């Protein structure tokens, strides 16, 4: 009879670490004025934090995403 191993805690830790890495990487792209790539990475980080269950970090990333989008991209609405 095989026993199942509970790896859910490890997955949550992985999601948080991956989210932190993506935020750090996005900051490098931001400094290099690669705003589109920065937004892509922040979007991915937001998803990782959501999966990892750290809603406060996800909200911080979302706020940063919206701030960059508002300040560095022009609205296409006419």
Annotate each predicted stretch with a short phrase.
Residues 11, 23, 30, 37, ...:
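Hydrophobic/aromatic side-chain positions at a characteristic register within alpha-helices
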Residues 18, 25, 32, 44-45, ...:
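Structural register within alpha-helical repeat arrays
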Residues 5, 63-78:
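Alpha-helical linker/edge segments of TPR/alpha-solenoid repeat scaffolds
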Residues 6, 11-13, 33, 53:
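Structural signature of alpha-solenoid helical repeat scaffolds
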Residues 39-70:
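Short, charge-rich amphipathic alpha-helical segments embedded
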Residues 5, 12, 17-20, 38-39, ...:
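Start-of-helix signal in alpha-solenoid helical-repeat scaffolds, especially tetratricopeptide repeats
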């Amino acid at each position: 009879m095989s026993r199942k191993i509970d790896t859910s805690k490890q997955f949550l830790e992985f999601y948080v670490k991956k989210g932190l890495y993506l935020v750090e990487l996005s900051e490098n792209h931001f400094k290099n004025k690669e705003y589109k790539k920065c937004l892509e990475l922040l979007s991915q980080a937001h998803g990782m934090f959501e999966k990892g269950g750290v809603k406060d970090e996800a909200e911080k990333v979302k706020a940063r995403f919206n701030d960059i989008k508002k300040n560095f991209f022009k609205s296409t609405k006419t």
